[in-house]
Amino acid sequence: MLFNPHTGPQASQLLSKSLPSFGKQRALAVKAILRRAGLRPTRQRIALGSLLFVETHRHITPGMLNEEALLLGEKLSVATVYNTLNQFADAGLIRKISIHGERTYFDTDTGDHAHFYICDQDQIVDIASGDIGIGPLPVPPAGYKISKVDVLIHLVPETTPS
């Protein structure tokens, strides 16, 4: 099965359906995913891909992923993790979600869906694609086309009336 990051299965689906979640087989699967996405399988990309491309969909920050890598003995700088995540996003393997331009999450689910952002918990929660509708989009300026639409709904706790 060839992987097309724009139309094919998600990287996590390819990995979870074909291999166990450990060992050399996992590294080989990640290498294949990276090559199919047009990325050279470097040690750092393989290590981070092995943590990301699992059956469970997740939202993760570079700092969170760096901590996971450290627990497994993979010493990488946060900058390396951030750059690698951006490369994965550019290749269509994951989605990038920016919060106020200050904090960046990466989503392993590249399918169409929106997100809630729970402000006081700094947490991202998926909204199923069928649970939200978007009306007609505006016509873009001459010479441009719409490449994607991201929906992020910010949530704060309801206040109890006194």
Residues covered by each model-derived region:
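Basic amphipathic alpha-helical segments that dock to polyanions
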Residues: 81-91
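Intrinsically disordered, low-complexity serine/threonine- and proline-rich regulatory segments
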Residues: 1-47, 53-54
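Non-DNA-binding regulatory cores of transcription-related proteins
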Residues: 90-162
